Amino acid sequence: MWLQNFLTGRTHQTKVGCDLSDVAELLSGIVQGSGIGPCMFLIYINELLIELSKYNITVRAFADDVKMYVQILDDLDVQRLQLAVDVLCQWATTWQLSISVNKCCVLNVGKSACDVSISINNGVVPVVEAVRDLGVQITKSLSPSVHINDVVSRANQRAAAILRAFVSRDVRLLMRAFITYVRPIVEYNSSIWSPSSVGDIESIERVQRRFTKRLPGLKNMSYDQRLKFLDIPSLELRRLRADLYWCYKIIFGLVAVQSDVFFTKNFCTSTRGHQYKLYKHQTSACVRSNFFAERVVNEWNNLPKSVDFSTLPRFKRTIKQVRFSNLRF
């Protein structure tokens, strides 16, 4: 009864200055900012996700952003995906929602991926080479270069704006602005797209290198000297630490992810190193070897005994004392 009263009989007005518009009835939606709103939306959308999962496809959703994907081996797999899309359209029609074909897309992943044609309400869904998924550019080849070029461009623009806007010559203040407004751009979700190619690694590092070189009094220092003077790590080192933090969270159950999906524990009896070593899978594909679950294993297994695994804060603190020899910066 309470939910029914919450959803029905609602009205709103618009106020401009001291004037109020006529009262209008709200026929759909809920109050923005309400505590129960997100919970009600999950109840609303979960019905669709349960129905789509019956077609033996993988479904993921974040708010109203729904993704469906399946391995295409023959025409039957394409038909199965199309049936799931038809169910989505029928559900939207039932709930009086409109789906725009132009806001949907098909991404064929892999070198040997066949062209798949999917339609929504008699309109063909466009096939794209890349799509932005929760802020990360995912390409057909799964290469991070497109995303890296995008974030580097935005980060350089933000860094230049900071140097133009701040008249202060306080190095610490300028560096604090960089850490607050620029560094998050090139580090958001880095465990998803962390690069392996030298060109991409240097492209990202160049953002911090250029900014620190333009700080007052630091122009004639080398990049390593500037990092030591400012007491900051390289961006490459920060990405490696972020990988290890995520690895710790997954292994010790601090996130809602099953660890055996990503990692296989190594039950070897070797006394060298720590006791939480992982099994390293052999892979010949360059793209796969750079996935988070593959690239982090060697660094994780090579952590010294001095690292404290008892809690995440202690793990982070002791990780900062570890020297990694395979970094460029």
Regions picked out by a protein language model, each given a short descriptive name:
Residues 3, 33, 62-64, 92, ...:
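Short, conserved catalytic/metal-binding micro-motifs enriched in Asp/Glu and His
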Residues 123-191:
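Basic, alpha-helical interaction scaffolds
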Residues 89-107, 200-268:
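Short, charged alpha-helical motifs in flexible N/C-terminal segments and linkers
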Residues 36, 66-90, 195:
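Catalytic palm subdomain of template-directed nucleic-acid polymerases
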Residues 19, 83, 98-131:
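Short, conserved micro-motifs composed of acidic
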Residues 20, 38-69:
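Active-site palm subdomain of RNA-directed nucleic acid polymerases
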Residues 265-300:
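Low-complexity, glycine/alanine/valine/leucine- and proline-rich hydrophobic stretches
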Residues 1-31, 70, 231:
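Conserved pre-catalytic core of RNA-dependent polymerases
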